[in-house]
Each structure stands twice: as C-alpha cells, then as structure tokens.
C-alpha cells in the first residue's frame, strides 16, 4: 500500500484519468473529491461490498 501525505486542496493523480483531491477535514472525517471517467465506477467500500453481494446472490 502506498501511503501519501496531502494537505487540504492538494491532489493525487492515479493513471492518466483519475484525480483525488483532499477537500477538507472535520473531526475524524475527511472529504475527498474524485474525478474519474464515467466508465470507471467509484464507490465507498461498504457500498461496493453490498453491490458485489447482490451480484453474487443473482447467480
């Protein structure tokens, strides 16, 4: 796992098409903005796991 330190307003670039920007910090939560092409799905982990479980149950 790559671990990076960023300040509010700074951005990470993943590949050629994805950017992740640190928008703010409030208490123990951070806000991130993610720009990615529509062909790339972006989900919170708990939502992704729920989607995968639903797909598995349909088989």
From Swiss-Prot:
GO terms for cellular component: cytosol. It holds the Pfam family CsrA. One of its GO terms (biological process) is positive regulation of translational initiation. Keywords: Activator, Cytoplasm, Repressor, RNA-binding, Translation regulation. NCBIfam families: csrA (TIGR00202), PRK01712.1 (NF002469). HAMAP family: CsrA. One of its GO terms (molecular function) is mRNA 5'-UTR binding. It is found in: Cytoplasm. A key translational regulator that binds mRNA to regulate translation initiation and/or mRNA stability. Mediates global changes in gene expression, shifting from rapid growth to stress survival by linking envelope stress, the stringent response and the catabolite repression systems. Usually binds in the 5'-UTR; binding at or near the Shine-Dalgarno sequence prevents ribosome-binding, repressing translation, binding elsewhere in the 5'-UTR can activate translation and/or stabilize the mRNA. Its function is antagonized by small RNA(s). Belongs to the CsrA/RsmA family. InterPro entries: CsrA, CsrA_sf. Homodimer; the beta-strands of each monomer intercalate to form a hydrophobic core, while the alpha-helices form wings that extend away from the core. Its main location: cytoplasm. This is Translational regulator CsrA.
């Amino acid at each position: 796992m790559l671990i990076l330190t960023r300040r509010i307003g700074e951005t990470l670039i993943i590949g050629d098409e994805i950017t992740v920007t640190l928008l703010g910090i409030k208490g123990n939560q951070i806000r991130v903005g993610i720009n990615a092409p529509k062909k790339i799905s972006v989900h919170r982990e708990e939502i992704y796991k729920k989607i995968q479980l639903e797909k598995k149950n349909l088989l």
